């Protein structure tokens, strides 16, 4: 499969990181985040489709997709900080943009091409295995054991060879420690069986799972564990930045209608994040219609009509008003589409 990363997305991300408005320790670069999250979700869906199991239920799928966002956010935080560290020269002066870009392109290329491709391929495998595991749980009354199948790789590694053809019950603690997919690009597999269990194989340190692959995505819904270096060895501020971003995503999703699928809601959230960034807007405190119309959020707002018992204007309830001499139409009408409640000029009569 052809794998690429948008040059335009990378360009926008570099411009954003270089700008004074961006804070790499406390924010997540949205252009990179959305692109990487979308690719990880694509990998997950590809993995689900390769499994012969029934498609995982929506709650489990949503957990996988949301955790892909968490992984992507930590990856971006690492990447943006690795590049931001090179912004200043030895004298503490900001480098010219073109010079800085030349210095950080190797970092960017490594993260969004070489490593991202490896992460994508591994995510496909582990999503496939997660779907399989859900099916194993559904069939455990008939097929209570799991069998480790040999690698299909042309050049299989030696680390998993001792586990080939091992058969253990699905709830055996062995599967908490070792599973196909706990090495990068592992091509081993599992199958459910009613064959009798075999003895536990010998183990040594060479057989340990690689960091970030030491969990079972079929039970926790994470294609990469919390022990991945992006998270376990994150730069300062990463956890707070990721938590803040995920809280905003969860907030947006909670406000969307129930007829949308989780996948559709997350896609809309991605789009909303881009809009918020592009327009430099953020959600404020809730405001009722009256407050919004009266522009109470703006302490300098001036009303066009003010109450006056001797005023010549009256509303439908009999209240009298006069024109406010301090009102300036050009200055004090903030929106051309402003909707009036009483007293609206349309409701006043002389």
How would you describe each model-predicted region?
Residues 1-109, 194-339:
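N-terminal leader/targeting and assembly helices and adjacent pre-domain segments
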Residues 104, 108-116, 124-132:
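N-terminal "first-domain core" detector
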Residues 340-347:
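Conserved small/polar residues in nucleotide/adenosyl-binding loops
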Residues 122-196, 331, 335:
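Conserved short secondary-structure elements within globular domains
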């Amino acid at each position: 499969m052809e794998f690429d990363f948008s040059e335009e997305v990378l360009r926008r991300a570099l411009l954003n990181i270089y700008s004074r408005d961006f804070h790499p320790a406390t924010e997540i670069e949205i252009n990179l985040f959305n692109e990487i999250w979308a690719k990880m979700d694509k990998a997950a869906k590809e993995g689900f489709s390769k499994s012969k199991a029934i498609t995982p239920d929506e709650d489990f799928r949503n957990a996988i997709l949301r955790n892909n966002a968490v992984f992507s956010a930590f990856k971006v935080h690492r990447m943006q900080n690795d590049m931001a560290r090179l912004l200043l020269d030895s004298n503490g002066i900001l480098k010219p943009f073109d010079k800085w870009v030349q210095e950080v392109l190797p970092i960017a290329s490594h993260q969004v091409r070489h490593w991202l491709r490896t992460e994508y391929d591994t995510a496909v495998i582990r999503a496939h295995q997660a779907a399989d595991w859900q099916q194993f749980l559904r069939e455990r009354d008939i097929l209570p054991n799991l069998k480790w199948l040999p690698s299909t790789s042309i050049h299989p590694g030696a680390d998993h060879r001792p586990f080939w053809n091992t058969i253990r019950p699905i709830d055996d603690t062995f599967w908490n420690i070792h599973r196909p997919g706990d090495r990068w690009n592992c091509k081993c597999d599992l199958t459910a069986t009613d064959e009798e269990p075999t003895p536990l194989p010998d183990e040594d340190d060479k057989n340990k799972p690689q960091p970030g692959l030491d969990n079972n995505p079929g039970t926790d819904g994470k294609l990469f564990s919390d022990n991945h270096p992006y998270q376990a060895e994150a730069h300062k501020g990463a956890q707070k930045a990721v938590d803040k971003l995920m809280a905003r995503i969860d907030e947006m999703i909670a406000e969307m209608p129930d007829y949308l699928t989780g996948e559709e809601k997350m896609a809309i959230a991605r789009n909303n994040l881009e809009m918020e960034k592009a327009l430099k807007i953020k959600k404020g405190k809730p405001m009722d219609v009256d407050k919004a119309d009266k522009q109470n959020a703006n302490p300098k707002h001036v009303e066009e009509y003010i109450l006056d018992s001797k005023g010549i204007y009256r509303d439908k309830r009999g209240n009298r008003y006069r024109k406010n001499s301090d009102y300036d139409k050009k200055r004090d009408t903030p929106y051309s589409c402003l909707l009036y409640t009483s007293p609206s000029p349309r409701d006043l009569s002389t």
